[in-house]
Amino acid sequence: MLYHLLYPLHTTYSYFNVFRYITFRTIYAAITALIICFLLGPWLIRKLRELKMGQVIRDDGPEAHLSKQGTPTMGGVLIIFAVVVSTLLWANLTIDYVWLVLMVTLGYGLIGFADDYRKLTRQSSRGVSGKVRLACEVCIALLVSVVLYAKPGFNSTIAIPFFKTVLPDLGWGYIFLSTFIIVGAANAVNLTDGLDGLAIGPAITCFMTYLLFAYFAGNFKIASYLQIPGVAGVGELSIFCGAIVGAGIGFLWYNTYPAQVFMGDTGSLSLGGALGCLAIVTKQEILLAIVGGIFVLETFSVIFQVGWFKLSHGKRIFRMAPIHHHFELKGWAEPKVIVRFWIISILLALLAISTLKLR
């Protein structure tokens, strides 16, 4: 919005020319989202308490978590609001990729909101039926995948990290892969959101990484030099990523241990869905498995735990899944688990960025 209002004035006032630079708008998108979260955070927490929107804790979880009962949840609405407002203010809204990621963010946020609301009204840790929730997630992801596949100039190849000449073309099968990535990323972030700040930390590092890849992919000279797929217009998603990084840091101010508010499924599903969509649009689908390694680890710990439990007739691989609970039950303090997972996430982000040259 500001881009469209102020940049045209650069012919009269040269200092408005700064609005043409993605880097400038990305920085201020992050600052805007950060300020929104800082300013509205206390009000939202107070309002959630008044409405008795408190977290319902599972009885079969770690005993230490019982003290979290009643902590305000659904804080993800703050992240979504800050991201949407900041993106609309600073991005070039003629780029359809911007609207696409916003649609996924809002769509998955709405699914998470319905899930959170149902849990609160039932006073149960079970929300919307798993089948219904999955069906809604698949519908949104499938719609986005079809739109992208049908978009002129969008190709169905996938980039393999560390291999510059390996670009397999999946054809129409790309629709199914991209649908799987969006749905998988959303639920992976959702599974990780079990400790104070555990999900938002790695999410910030993931979006910072994709901020770089979106910027590089949107600049064909840089993309050609780095030998990564170039995508016209995708550089504007750097602004969206910047907004999420700013909102994430602002939210972490209130979500860090001991948390004053939880993002709930509203936040985790929207962040995960947006992350999956970014991986597809920037043509860095496989890279998500590296930079989002924490989310992958959490997901596979649940899959292996459930699978082995059924195959072995009641035996477990971990003391509890997702794996962050396993470390809690081993005696690790919650802040130690969180910070160590953050450290791993940062290292994985650096590894992902290194693929720009290691190819």
Curated annotation (Swiss-Prot):
Q: Which domain of life is it from?
A: Bacteria
Location (main, coarse): membrane
Q: How does it sit in the membrane?
A: Multi-pass membrane protein
| Enzymatic class | transferase
Q: Where in the cell is it found?
A: Cell inner membrane
Segments crossing the lipid bilayer: 26-46, 75-95, 97-117, 134-154, 166-186, 197-217, 233-253, 261-281, 286-306, 336-356
**What cofactor does its activity depend on?**
Mg(2+)
Its UniProt pathway annotation is:
Cell wall biogenesis; peptidoglycan biosynthesis
Q: Which CDD domains match?
A: GT_MraY (cd06852)
Q: Does the keyword Magnesium apply?
A: yes
UniProt keyword list: Cell cycle, Cell division, Cell inner membrane, Cell membrane, Cell shape, Cell wall biogenesis/degradation, Magnesium, Membrane, Metal-binding, Peptidoglycan synthesis, Transferase, Transmembrane, Transmembrane helix
Q: Per the record's keyword annotation, is Glycosyltransferase included, yes or no?
A: no
Disulfide cross-links: none
Q: Which GO terms describe its cellular component?
A: plasma membrane
Picking any one GO molecular function of the record gives: UDP-N-acetylmuramoyl-L-alanyl-D-glutamyl-meso-2,6-diaminopimelyl-D-alanyl-D-alanine:undecaprenyl-phosphate transferase activity
Catalysed reaction(s) here are: UDP-N-acetyl-alpha-D-muramoyl-L-alanyl-gamma-D-glutamyl-meso-2,6-diaminopimeloyl-D-alanyl-D-alanine + di-trans,octa-cis-undecaprenyl phosphate = di-trans,octa-cis-undecaprenyl diphospho-N-acetyl-alpha-D-muramoyl-L-alanyl-D-glutamyl-meso-2,6-diaminopimeloyl-D-alanyl-D-alanine + UMP
* Classification via InterPro entries: Glycosyl_transferase_4 (IPR000715), PNAcMuramoyl-5peptid_Trfase (IPR003524), PNAcMuramoyl-5peptid_Trfase_CS (IPR018480)
- Please state the Enzyme Commission number of this protein: 2.7.8.13
Biological process (GO), any one: peptidoglycan biosynthetic process
Q: Which family does it belong to?
A: Belongs to the glycosyltransferase 4 family. MraY subfamily.
Q: What does this protein do?
A: Catalyzes the initial step of the lipid cycle reactions in the biosynthesis of the cell wall peptidoglycan: transfers peptidoglycan precursor phospho-MurNAc-pentapeptide from UDP-MurNAc-pentapeptide onto the lipid carrier undecaprenyl phosphate, yielding undecaprenyl-pyrophosphoryl-MurNAc-pentapeptide, known as lipid I.
Q: What's this protein's name? A: Phospho-N-acetylmuramoyl-pentapeptide-transferase
> Whose protein is this, by species?
Syntrophus aciditrophicus (strain SB)
**What lineage does the source organism belong to?**
Bacteria, Pseudomonadati, Thermodesulfobacteriota, Syntrophia, Syntrophales
